[in-house]
Amino acid sequence: MEAKDIILKAIQHRTSENPISNVELAQLCRSYGFNLSTERVREEIRLMRKDGVLILSQASAGGGYYMSRSMDDYLRFRNTNLLPRVIDMQDTMKLMDYAAKREYKMDAQARLF
């Protein structure tokens, strides 16, 4: 059993009304002999999400991680958590591309692709 298995098993029993924090997950992993920091817990969750595991989160007080139970759960998370980050990063990239083009007086577009 790996640390990610412990994390996933703990999250699978959680809902949006009863999420588990990364601190609790790190403590749980330690109880099984895995010395994971909260940052490493977040990384394990990020990797599981990339594998298609529908782990959701809420950042509010008392927040934490939980499993998606429906398409509505997933879409709410996607639209309030993921999408704003993607849009912000895309906006930042466009502004930096424009600034680089001005700064270096060249067509940045040609060099970016």
Question: What role is predicted for each listed range?
Answer:
Residues 49-59:
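A short, conserved structural fragment
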Residues 35-50:
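Short amphipathic alpha-helical interaction segments
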Residues 72-95:
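Short, amphipathic alpha-helical interaction segments positioned at domain boundaries
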Residues 17-28:
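Short acidic, hydrophobic short linear motifs in intrinsically disordered regions
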Residues 26-38:
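Short helix-coil junctions and helix-kink-helix linkers
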